[in-house]
Amino acid sequence: MHYIAIATFARDLGTVKEILLRRRQYTYPSEFKNAQSYFDVQGGRAVIHFETDNAEAILRYTTDWPELVFDIFPVIPTESAWEYSTP
């Protein structure tokens, strides 16, 4: 299943620096396939796309980043966009 996670964080300089440094070194859980992330410093959010069938991997990923607040959405790829998938 594909997921889009929107992570929000405080926009203070210390938090942003820490997140950027950790992000460069971070290894996604091995159960994540095709993980991609986009970081918006000014907006205080990151968008992460990944594929996994393992709920524990999602939990492990979110606990690795306690300073972030996650909204995670299951999505289905279509020809023109990603569509929200109702569970």
Outline where the language-model segments fall.
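Alpha-helix C-cap/termination motif
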Residues: 41, 64-65
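A short, polar/proline- and glycine-enriched secondary-structure boundary/capping micro-motif
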Residues: 16, 59, 69-73
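Conserved catalytic core of Hanks-type protein kinase domains
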Residues: 51-52, 64
